[in-house]
Amino acid sequence: MYSAMPGGDVAILTGRFSLLLEHRGKRPKVHESAYVAPTATICGDVTMGENSRVLFGAVVTAEGGPVEIGAECIVMENAVIRGAPKHPIRIGDHVLVRPRAYLTGCNIENNVFLATGSTVFNGAHLGEGSEVRVNGIVHLRTVLQKDSLVPIGWVAVGDPVEILPSHEHERIWALQEPLDFPGTVFGVERGPAGTMTPEMTRRYARGLEKHREDLPLGAGERLIVEG
């Protein structure tokens, strides 16, 4: 249950959050038993489940796509979890996100371990019980089946997935190129090297402009719980 107030709102305890933001008219929804450290940031359409924790310096931001974090999840120091317009983030229960991990627009099932420095890209799906070890990468639109393992520094790419050491550049690129990173993430057609970045940054800047309208929520303000 969320900590209800009259009208179906939720109270934020004084001093519990450092930077809690309304973004695009959406406010975070945080279970009364969850904890967010004083230097963490929670922005926009973010839902945190029972007994979950977001630690110091972590950022959880819904930039056009919602972020759902289940029960008893741990998001550790300086991790980033980012929902994207076409790729919301859904994280199941009992998921551990270690420091400096980066997750954007992905689906994480229950009981997944994401080690320090791991990266999971847009459209990826990690099956229950999977592990991505230190500096491992799960690339765009990649699917890991239940109990999969990405070793230290290796790259998982494709569906069906291949899990490869990082030095196998040519094989990784052969699998990655058809997944169309610029088109999937930025809506930009792939062109010659160096020609896509101006349009990608222009489009991304337009989306990020919405943050100018963010409203910081003070301690004790109420969070709207829809429905």
Regions found by a protein language model. Name each.
Residues Y2-G25, E63, E77-N78, A84-I91, ...:
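Glycine-rich hexapeptide-repeat left-handed beta-helix
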Residues G70-I74:
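A short glycine/small-residue-enriched secondary-structure motif
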